[in-house]
Amino acid sequence: MGTVPAGSRRAPGCGEGMFILCLALLLAPGAPAQYSVDDFGGLGRMFDGIGAISGGGATSRLLVNYPEPQRTEILDYLFKPNFGASLHIFKVEIGGDAQTTDGTEPSHMHYPDDQNYFRGYEWWLMKEAKKRNPAIKLIGLPWAFPGWIGYGKNWPYDFPDVTAYYVVSWIIGAKQYHNLDIDYIGIWNERAYDIKYIKVLRHTLDRLGLTNVGIIAADGDWGIAHDVLIDPYLNEAVQVIGAHYPGTHAAQDAIQTGKTLWASEDYSTYNDEVGGGCWARILNQNYVNGNMTSTISWNMVASYYEQLPFGLEGLMTAKEPWSGNYVVSTPIWITAHTTQFTQPGWYYLRTVGHLDKGGSYVALTDRLGNLTVIIETMSHNNSICIRPPLPEYNVSAQNATFYLQGSFQNLQELQVWYSNLDINNTKPVTFKKLTPVKVQNGSFTLQLGVNEVYTVTTLLTGQKGSFPDPPKSKPFPLKYKDDFSVRNPPFSEAPYFADQSGVFEYFTNTSDPGDHVFTFRQVLTQRPITWASDANQAISVIGNYQWSNITVTCDIYIETVETGGVFVAARVDQGGSPTDRAKGIFFWVFADGTYKVTGDLIGEIVLCKGLAGVRARSWHTLTLHVDGTNASGLLNGSPLWKEVVTGGPLHGWAAIGTSSFEFTQFDNFMIEAKDPE
């Protein structure tokens, strides 16, 4: 008996004499379309796994400050096999000291003679991922670079050996200090690639014995594929061609290379049922339409202040460490439909494709007799991703019969997992185990509604993991203080502060044996090679974006003589990539003895100014009080200015920062806010 091509409407066993009868039966109302699941004619491409990204930037910033057991629970939902998302791949930002969407992530080398492999939280996250799944693949990708790499230019490629040394040092540090083996490394996220640099990077990796580290290029569009086709040395250097938000289609040049193709960043959509529908559709159709064998979500967990760009666009949400509340969102369970029933190294079958009345199906095997089929019927309006635009199409309810052939023809029963994401449902169904389906005469039939996901599999290992409900959501505390007195901090950043320009770190002030031994310090002294339009000022935000009436107090220590400057702020209305456009109330003092009150971060909207008598290298206390339309400021407990009309945003975060990239210390930070409700 011949095989039935995917989407064929001819049933097995229809000989020439019975063709008219068979055709009539197939075209009868409600007759199921028929699809083959067959490995007899060979297999498709090898499956590389489903993954997610931390970074690009600071998307996991608040996660590290969660209390236990909630922090462990969140990590289990993300990484634990056969429990939640069960991710196969984990991609992190190689911090470059610059704003990369929702904040800055610190570099392991702020300066040429500086190496510190404990900054930030990506090392910790990679270890937590490996702890739960030792087989998870790890990827590092720079979004930005410390300024010294560019030798004064906003460009990382003029000295490719220097950039390669910097990136490879991160890989070596991961192994030396954390016993982490990095599997893949990228070039420069969504920015220009440089062919010479890619070759130098490959040579450097090989020379240092890192031949197993693959290069992914170029984390933008498919443009590098043309260069790979015409340059045999580049072709040899690149292991994976990765594109972002490909709309489920790969360029012909990319397919022609014969290389592994990935959607190396995708999704980036609000994590409700529509976001889940987006994720379900592209997880299947990135392979069906584009031969992409891995899809990686930006971002993994929305663990940053919601009012920053792309709020709630993670697979799940964990944005309230002060309350312990988190939300296991729909995309977690859509991920599980694939990840819990496949592994990297499985193979797609050639018999994959689109369903007759809309939707798609893929089938994968471990070549040891196991089979997993994932089916999605996402409608257009229930699966719109943030980008690119989605052309209109129709999906309707349908019956589908799947014929198991080749090595699967003797299967008798398959496990079934089901989700219904229809936005009109008051209670969507996610990842529900149904009664196993019996295979009769080598086939099984499903009644497929619209906006449904089915996983049909030989594997018995699926689980919808759960924990007791987390604590209820509550806003940031109205009173909060931090004296930064942590002798051995587990992380380099103080809780809840979200750096938006510059890098703020715990600091031990050995020159001050008194009250300011342990402080919080802005440590960048040079503008980084940026990914966004970074501010020239450093700023870290904290608190509740809805705060309006507030008092912010902080001890400050300017280290730069004559030109140094520092601020405390309230009602800061912008973070992320547009931080340089932030408005609010900013109270500045400078090492030249002056002060200034501005309505913006860049200092163009001057509300008042005068003499303060502040000098560098001594501690002072700044207090900013904002109430209604008026603001006032105190220096060392005495009024310096008062009743300045604000005229700017009505609410926003509290913040601290510096007038340039310069060393400055902060201590005894305190907030007292009135309930915005």
Swiss-Prot record:
The keyword Glycoprotein applies. Keywords: Disulfide bond, Glycoprotein, Glycosidase, Hydrolase, Lipid degradation, Lipid metabolism, Lysosome, Signal, Sphingolipid metabolism. Gene3D superfamilies: Aldolase class I, Exo-inulinase, domain 1, Glycosidases. GO terms for biological process: galactosylceramide catabolic process. Its EC number is 3.2.1.46. One of its GO terms (cellular component) is lysosome. The active site is at E190, E265. It catalyses: a beta-D-galactosyl-(1<->1')-N-acylsphing-4-enine + H2O = an N-acylsphing-4-enine + D-galactose; beta-D-galactosyl-(1<->1)-sphing-4-enine + H2O = sphing-4-enine + D-galactose; a D-galactosylceramide + H2O = an N-acyl-sphingoid base + D-galactose. Substrate binds at T101, W143, N189, R387. It is an enzyme of class 3 (hydrolase). Residues 1-33 form the signal peptide. GO terms for molecular function: galactosylceramidase activity. Its main location: other. Belongs to the glycosyl hydrolase 59 family. PANTHER family: GALACTOCEREBROSIDASE. Hydrolyzes the galactose ester bonds of glycolipids such as galactosylceramide and galactosylsphingosine. This is Galactocerebrosidase. The gene is galc.
